[in-house]
Swiss-Prot record:
It is an enzyme of class 3 (hydrolase). Belongs to the TRAFAC class translation factor GTPase superfamily. Classic translation factor GTPase family. LepA subfamily. It catalyses: GTP + H2O = GDP + phosphate + H(+). The keyword Protein biosynthesis applies. One of its GO terms (cellular component) is plasma membrane. The keyword Amino-acid biosynthesis does not apply. GO terms for biological process: positive regulation of translation. This is Elongation factor 4. Keywords: Cell inner membrane, Cell membrane, GTP-binding, Hydrolase, Membrane, Nucleotide-binding, Protein biosynthesis. It is a peripheral membrane protein. GTP binds at D14, H15, G16, K17, S18, T19, N131, K132, I133, D134. Required for accurate and efficient protein synthesis under certain stress conditions. May act as a fidelity factor of the translation reaction, by catalyzing a one-codon backward translocation of tRNAs on improperly translocated ribosomes. Back-translocation proceeds from a post-translocation (POST) complex to a pre-translocation (PRE) complex, thus giving elongation factor G a second chance to translocate the tRNAs correctly. Binds to ribosomes in a GTP-dependent manner.
Length: 597
C-alpha cells in the first residue's frame, strides 16, 4: 500500500494537462516510443481536435524513484470542462492527490480554480506545477503569486517543468511521491469500489473503471451495484497501462477496470459503489448523485426518412454517454425528431458534432432552452423543457427559472465590459475581488441567458482573456413570457422562445426582421408576426413575386389593364389559401443569432 500513489491532473483548457500526462506515461515506460502519440489518453478524435478531455481515462504506471524504491502510480485523467464537473468530482474522489497544472505564461484561470476547489473540498492533496516554462513569455513568479492569492494554497515550491520538451517532468513525479499520501484502506474488509467512469465495448459490454477503496475484487465474484441493486458476475479485472492488462485481482488502493457482462451503460452509473455478495458493505461510498440534464434542444433529421437512423445514432451515443437524455417529439414545422437533454452547451455541441461526424447525420437543431418550473393556479407544479409545451398563460400563477452562480476571471482592463455584459444578461453582482492583475467576479445570472450566447459574447468583449465556470443555484420566480412566431397566421412551434418580458418586444421585432431576410419570396405575400399569447408585438411582410401581366398590352384601355391586374390578384389570393411556406434551415439558426440589445 505504501508504494501506491493515486493522482489526477487538474488544469484549465490548453494549459498542457494531456501533454504532461503523455510525458509521465513515457517516462514510466507505459508505452514504447513507437506507440507513443500526442494525447494518448484522449481517445475520441473530437477530444484531440478541440484539445479537451471528455471521458475519464487511467494509466497504471511503475516508476523507480531516486530513493531506489519502486512506486505504482495510478494516473486518472479528468475532464476539465464545467459541463463535466460531476465526472471531475468522481475522478478526484478516487485520488489522494492532484497535480495542479498552471500555464506559467497565463496564470490561473476559472476552470482551474473550480476544479481545484472541488479537490480541496474532497480532501485531496494539491501539488502545484508550473508548465510551459520553455516559453519566452513565461512568468513563473507571477503565476506562483496568483496560485497563492486566488486559490490560497502554498506554492513557493511549485515544480517548474515543460511538458512539451520533457524538462522537469521527473521532478514533478518526485514531488508527487513526496507530497501525496498513500491510499488508506483494508484489503480484507468487505469490498467497496467506486465507479469513476464506464463505457461500452462492442465485445464485452460495459467496462467500468473503478477505484477499490476497501476489500479485494476477483473474477467470478458476485458483484452488487448499490445504487441500482443489480447483481452481476465479474468476468475479468485488470488495469490500463494505458493498454489494458488483465490481473488476477484488484485490491484496496488500486485503480483498474471491471467487466461483468453488463449490457446497458445506464446500469453502471458513475459514482456508484460496487460491493460483493455474500459479504456486502454496510453503506455505499458518499457522493453519488443522479446527473440531471440542464439544457434541452430539439434535434430533427433534415430528411424525414432519416428518423430511425437518428434514433439508432442517439442510442449508440448513449451507450457511451449516460448523461445524454432523449425522447421522441413531433413538431408541425419540422416533423419527427427528438427532444434531447444535455449537461451544458459544450456537451450539446459535442453530441451534435459526433452525430454529424461519426454517424453522418444532417440535423436541424432548435434553440437551446432550460427547464422552467411552472406554478399553476390549481397549486400543481409543472416542469417545462420545451417552449411549445408551455401551458396557457391564464392558468399560470408564476414561472420559476433556474439561476446559476457564475465565476468569471479576467485581466482588470476588461472588467468594465464584462460587467456591462452581465448586467445586460439580467445578472446581479455578488462579489468582486482583485488578485494582482486578475479580477474575480461572481454573478448570479439566469441560466436561460447563459445558454443563448453568453460564452461567445464574453470571449469577444474580453478579447478571449476572460474565463468562466458556472453551477446551478436555485429556481426563482421570474417574469418570463413565451414569444410565438406566426407565418401567415400559422404558429411555427419550433421557433417559439421563452424570454424575459423586458426583452420580449425587442426580441420579437428582431426575430421577425431576421425571418424576413431569410424566407424566400413566394408567389403571394407572406406575413411574419411575433406574438405573446394573442397579442401581436411585431410584424414584417415578405412581398410577393409577380409577373408583369401588363407587358403585352401596349397602351390600350385602362379597364383592360385593371381586369388583368384584378385577375392576377384573385389568383394570388387563391394561392395564398392553399399555399404553405417552406421555412429554410437557416431560419432556425437565425433565432440563435439574434443579439440582445
Amino acid at each position: 500500500m505504501d508504494h501506491i500513489r493515486n493522482f489526477s491532473i487538474i488544469a484549465h483548457i490548453d494549459h498542457g494537462k494531456s501533454t504532461l500526462a503523455d510525458r509521465i506515461i513515457q517516462l514510466c515506460g507505459g508505452l514504447s516510443d513507437r506507440e507513443m502519440e500526442a494525447q494518448v489518453l484522449d481517445s475520441m478524435d473530437i477530444e484531440k481536435e478541440r484539445g479537451i478531455t471528455i471521458k475519464a481515462q487511467t494509466a497504471a504506471l511503475t516508476y523507480k524513484a531516486r530513493d531506489g524504491k519502486v512506486y505504482n502510480l495510478n494516473l486518472i485523467d479528468t475532464p476539465g470542462h464545467v459541463d463535466f464537473s460531476y465526472e471531475v468530482s468522481r475522478s478526484l474522489s478516487a485520488c489522494e492527490g492532484a497535480l495542479l497544472v498552471v500555464d506559467a505564461s497565463q496564470g490561473v484561470e476559472a476552470q482551474t480554480v473550480a476544479n481545484c476547489y472541488t479537490a480541496i473540498e474532497l480532501g485531496v492533496e494539491v501539488v502545484p506545477v508550473l508548465n510551459k516554462i520553455d516559453l519566452p513569455q513565461a512568468d513563473p513568479a507571477n503565476a506562483i503569486q496568483e496560485i497563492e492569492d486566488v486559490i490560497g494554497i502554498d506554492a513557493h515550491d511549485a515544480t517548474p517543468c515543460s511538458a512539451k520538451t520533457g524538462q522537469g517532468v521527473e521532478d514533478v513525479i518526485e514531488a508527487l511521491i513526496a507530497k501525496v499520501p498513500p491510499p488508506k484502506g483494508d484489503a480484507s474488509a468487505p469490498l467497496q469500489a467506486l465507479i469513476i467512469d464506464s463505457w461500452f465495448d462492442n465485445y464485452v459490454g460495459v467496462v467500468m473503471l473503478v477505484r477499490v477503496v476497501n476489500g479485494t475484487l476477483r473474477p467470478k465474484d458476485k458483484a452488487l451495484l448499490m445504487a441500482t441493486g443489480a447483481q452481476h458476475l465479474v468476468e475479468q479485472v485488470g488495469v490500463f497501462s494505458p493498454k489494458s492488462v488483465q490481473r488476477d485481482s484488484l485490491t484496496a488502493g488500486q485503480v483498474g477496470f471491471v467487466i461483468a457482462g453488463i449490457k446497458e451503460l445506464k446500469a453502471a452509473k458513475v459514482g456508484d459503489t460496487i460491493t460483493t455478495l455474500p459479504r456486502k458493505a454496510e453503506a455505499p461510498l458518499p457522493g453519488f448523485k443522479e446527473v440531471k440534464p440542464q439544457v434541452f434542444a430539439g434535434l430533427y433529421p433534415v430528411e424525414a426518412n432519416q428518423y430511425e437512423a437518428l434514433r439508432e445514432s442517439l442510442e449508440k451515443l448513449r451507450l457511451n454517454d449516460a448523461s445524454l437524455m432523449f425522447e421522441p417529439e413531433v413538431s408541425q414545422a419540422l416533423g419527427f425528431g427528438f427532444r434531447c437533454g444535455f449537461l451544458g452547451l459544450l456537451h450539446m455541441e459535442i453530441v451534435q458534432e459526433r452525430l454529424e461526424r461519426e454517424f453522418d447525420m444532417d440535423l436541424i437543431t432548435t434553440a437551446p432552452t432550460v427547464v422552467y418550473q411552472v406554478q399553476m393556479r390549481d397549486g400543481t407544479m409543472v416542469t417545462v423543457e420545451n417552449p411549445a409545451k408551455m401551458p396557457d398563460p391564464s392558468r399560470i400563477e408564476a414561472i420559476l427559472e433556474p439561476i446559476v452562480t457564475v465565476n468569471l476571471y479576467m485581466p482588470q482592463e476588461y472588467v468594465g465590459s464584462v460587467i456591462t455584459l452581465c448586467t445586460q444578461k439580467r445578472g446581479s453582482q455578488i462579489n468582486m475581488s482583485y488578485h494582482g492583475k486578475q479580477v474575480q467576479l461572481t454573478y448570479e445570472i439566469p441560466m436561460a441567458e447563459i445558454v443563448m450566447d453568453f460564452f461567445d459574447r464574453l470571449k469577444s468583449v474580453s478579447r478571449g482573456y476572460a474565463s468562466m465556470d458556472y453551477e446551478f443555484k436555485e429556481y426563482r420566480p421570474s417574469d418570463v413570457v413565451k414569444v410565438d412566431i406566426l407565418i401567415n397566421s400559422d404558429k411555427v412551434d419550433a421557433l417559439s422562445v421563452i424570454v424575459h418580458r423586458s426583452n420580449s418586444q425587442y426580441r420579437g421585432r428582431e426575430v421577425a426582421a431576421k425571418m424576413r431576410e431569410i424566407i424566400p419570396r413566394q408567389m403571394y405575400d407572406v406575413a411574419i408576426q411575433a406574438a405573446i399569447g394573442s397579442n401581436i408585438i411585431a410584424r414584417e411582410n415578405v412581398k410577393a413575386l409577380r409577373k408583369n401581366v401588363l407587358a403585352k398590352c401596349y397602351g390600350g384601355d385602362i379597364s383592360r389593364k385593371k381586369k388583368l391586374l384584378e385577375k392576377q390578384k384573385a389568383g394570388k389570393k387563391r394561392m395564398k389559401q392553399v399555399g404553405t411556406v417552406e421555412i429554410p434551415q437557416e431560419a432556425f439558426l437565425a433565432i440563435l443569432q439574434v443579439d440582445d440589445k
